[in-house]
Amino acid sequence: MLENKKMEFWFVVGSQHLYGEEALKEVRKNSETIVDELNKSANLPYKIIFKDLATSADKIKEIMKEVNYRDEVAGVITWMHTFSPAKMWIAGTKILQKPLLHFATQYNENIPWKTIDMDYMNLHQSAHGDREYGFINARLKKHNKVVVGYWKDKEVQKQVSDWMKVAAGYIASESIKVARFGDNMRNVAVTEGDKVEAQIQFGWTVDYFGIGDLVAEMDKVSQDEINKTYEEFKDLYILDPGENDPAFYEKQVKEQIKIEIGLRRFLEKGNYNAFTTNFEDLYGMKQLPGLAVQRLNAEGYGFAGEGDWKTAALDRLLKVMTNNTATGFMEDYTYELSRGNEKALGAHMLEVDPTFASDKPKVIVKPLGIGDKEDPARLIFNGSTGKGVAVSMLDLGTHYRLIINGLTAVKPDEDMPNLPVAKMVWKPEPNFIEGVKSWIYAGGGHHTVVSLELTVEQVYDWSRMVGLEAVIIDKDTKLRDIIEKTTK
């Protein structure tokens, strides 16, 4: 299982010496209380550390330098308790290389209408400080996040939590390594891309390996290891031979287990956390990896088919953000076009991510019409329901583009007893017709990463962190705006 690294966020509070030591003591006390209460709330995925008061340019620069070199620090949350002259923030903010959230809150929820005086105003002037600080971030084009509201409010805490998850993904992105077994599927356009630019902009390392390298690792797997894993399957899944001879069924499933163990070892040796395969490049293998891929997806590995390394890396990135919950590789396959009931059916030839499963997955063995190999084993299940996003990354030659489409996953209208793959059904925003049109005009690929844990805003926040063009297709989308933005 790939575990997310332990991370923390530093809380830095803006003020100045103008107000005197007694005021600064109160600022520090209030700051410590906020951090302590936020950590106790259990509403945040990572711990917040109160670092210090920011009362001089040298102090701020010193803090930001430390943020940059401390691997465990994923980002900075700033709060302006009082007015904090923003020229002090320029040097430190310029060198900050990690995500920044400006928390526009204040210690007290209410104005003490009957007793408020200038002492109170001088101490509790976040409204004043927020605007000065916000100006310098805008001037520096920092692409920071702004969260506004009372710090005890659960919805406000959720916004901070959502940003923390994205910031953790941003940090993890620098460590994403994709192993490509074989090249891209021949003649397919959208899966191509500039690997050097992806490493510069997103931190992704993409390495090629011949399929023989994987086969060599598979050959080292012992029968005892395979048998032990097969026994574990009896508790995890429904083993369904169907019309297959039981001995043949077991043999095919165990071949996928052999692939799984060999593949995992190969990835672990090279510290890879994402990978691709290609059904056109299977020399030396008996089956296209199916169940093997799905099992590794469940452990947090990113994946995409047909050599699509961009989507595999994106899959790993979003899995970090969601702690590998209801997030995975997907492909738009076919439409339901009945008026008023339009929707898309998503699947893939084998490798649908089991983090989507709404029921206990079933292991089946069926023929596969492509790849010219033996019948592969795979997990089948119905996908979960709920609101989420479909995300596609494409290389336009001049730059990368990220397309983010809000969606609602729904139950299928009927059972699909003859479809031998896992599947998910969804309705894109703002509606089926305009959603699909917008996707096509924007150049969106047929491969996506779907997540039922992330929001459009979270994925958009990541795009801003890395300076990536984003096309948002959601409930507020106007088709003409999409056309104007994407076809000039």
Swiss-Prot record:
Pfam families: AraA_central (PF24856), AraA_N (PF02610), Arabinose_Iso_C (PF11762). Coiled coil: none annotated. The keyword Transport does not apply. InterPro entries: Ara_Isoase_C, AraA_central, AraA_N, AraA_N_sf, Fuc/Ara_isomerase_C, Fucose_isomerase_N/cen_sf, Lara_isomerase. Its EC number is 5.3.1.4. One of its GO terms (molecular function) is manganese ion binding. Pathway: Carbohydrate degradation; L-arabinose degradation via L-ribulose; D-xylulose 5-phosphate from L-arabinose (bacterial route): step 1/3. Mn(2+) binds at E306, E331, H348, H447. Its cofactor is Mn(2+). Keywords: Arabinose catabolism, Carbohydrate metabolism, Isomerase, Manganese, Metal-binding. It catalyses: beta-L-arabinopyranose = L-ribulose. GO terms for cellular component: cytosol. Binds 1 Mn(2+) ion per subunit. Gene3D superfamilies: 3.40.50.10940. GO terms for biological process: L-arabinose catabolic process to xylulose 5-phosphate. Catalyzes the conversion of L-arabinose to L-ribulose. Belongs to the arabinose isomerase family. NCBIfam families: PRK02929.1 (NF002795). This is L-arabinose isomerase 2.
